[in-house]
Amino acid sequence: MTELHYLTVSAAHTALAAGELTAVELTEACLARINATEPQIRAFLHLTPEAALAAARAADERRRRGQALSPLDGIPIGIKDVICTNGVPTTAGSRILAGFRPPYNATVIERLLAAGTVLIGKLNCDEFAMGSSTENSAYQITTNPWDTSRVPGGSSGGSAAAVAAGQVPATLGTDTGGSIRQPAALCGISGLKPTYGRVSRYGLIAYGSSLDQIGPMAWTVADLALIMNVIAGHDPRDGTSAPLPTPDYTAALTGDIRGLRIGIPREYFVEGMEPGVEAATRTAIEVLREQGATLVEVSLPHTKYALPTYYIIAPAEASANLARFDGVRYGFRAEGETMWEQIEQTRGQGFGPEVRRRIMLGTYALSAGYYDAYYRRAQQVRTLIKRDFDQVFNEVDLLATPTSPTVAFPIGQKINDPLAMYLSDVCTLPINLAGVPALVVPCGFSDGLPVGLQLIGRPFDEATLLRVGDAYQRVTDWHTRRPDLARA
């Protein structure tokens, strides 16, 4: 058997069901791995070992009685620290939420607990999910397990690094402009951004309310399908949740992609893309052709406007969402002679520089004199971007593109150059603006660092993406590669 800490979710489920492994043994292996690697990786902000072991013991007892709740029963999982967990610190990577313990669970947490998963802790992220490197956390900088001098991506960098380092078999992340997919690619794991509305956002600390989506991160597409079977589905507590039936995602993994038409959008192979990244991506796309898919070159002409459009809409939504954090009822509170001075000092000291930058940008875009020139126009361009996807999906079943124009970059290289950092998400932002689903699978290496292939689907057609990603993983072994932390 593979080292316990590097088991996939699917392999762990098989071993648990066969009685070859107990949930307690698996949880103890994960906790030991976290203790051994956390000084290098710094993925976790808060651990819950006692609760995790208690949940694992309960899972073992259910399995002994033949009453396992789901294939995830007894599987440890980590949670990005923007998702509310009852009684467990939830900071969104921000000083302003220091010490905050939510009085309720997010819907995705309720569903994971009902399925018997073992919640092992909360994972580091860029503050309020604003960033592409996890350097914006108020608490620590997470490193990439393939090279600890480099970033893991962001904003779900802790979620990606924890899987890649073998700390947990799977995690939840969130994706507002690429925050599941880019770190998955940079850390050599698989990650899915579901369609907007497919997974409940109730209990998610919002960054951009029309863009955010919760999704799974793990080694394999089969693992993602198992998690989606638990977390997907309508939630009446979330007004943005789609009242649609959800398929059995594992049943979609047939291995057969013959006859599918895959579009290759020319705009995604951007100027400045590293040659090794483009080569690995094109090689992966060729594998799909060899498996029976038809490749079609297509165009998404408004892609070039996605970056400025996103950086008007997302900060505008952040400006509104983050207005609620004032230190009056919970979290960090600064001193002040008056209530208004206290609030001003709390927000000035509690928010980090990138969050303050985006709040100011969003407030400016929403101001009376500039609303039409910026925010309204950005929403109009967003409609054109969405229309591009609608039209291209009349011709093809899905799209295949690079995920990031580069491999993981050195820590500190871009943190003082916001535009360079924003360009890291040039291949992922349009998908959030359009609200469609996208999957990332590892597809090779460039200069010894992982590269990810991005597959983009029709709205609510995650099943086809998972089918194609799983078929790709059946004939390649990139998802089986593991970093050597002794050399990282």
Curated annotation (Swiss-Prot):
Gene Ontology CC annotations of this record: glutamyl-tRNA(Gln) amidotransferase complex
Cited InterPro entries: Amidase, Amidase_CS, Amidase_dom, AS_sf, GatA
Cross-referenced Pfam families: Amidase (PF01425)
Catalytic machinery residues: 80, 155, 179
Reactions it catalyzes: L-glutamyl-tRNA(Gln) + L-glutamine + ATP + H2O = L-glutaminyl-tRNA(Gln) + L-glutamate + ADP + phosphate + H(+)
EC code: 6.3.5.7
GO biological process: translation
GO molecular function: ATP binding; glutaminyl-tRNA synthase (glutamine-hydrolyzing) activity
Record Gene3D superfamilies: Amidase signature (AS) domain
Main EC class the enzyme belongs to: ligase
Keywords: ATP-binding, Ligase, Nucleotide-binding, Protein biosynthesis
Family: Belongs to the amidase family. GatA subfamily.
NCBIfam families: gatA
Known partners and oligomeric status: Heterotrimer of A, B and C subunits.
Function: Allows the formation of correctly charged Gln-tRNA(Gln) through the transamidation of misacylated Glu-tRNA(Gln) in organisms which lack glutaminyl-tRNA synthetase. The reaction takes place in the presence of glutamine and ATP through an activated gamma-phospho-Glu-tRNA(Gln).
Annotated protein name in UniProt: Glutamyl-tRNA(Gln) amidotransferase subunit A
Protein's organism: Chloroflexus aggregans (strain MD-66 / DSM 9485)
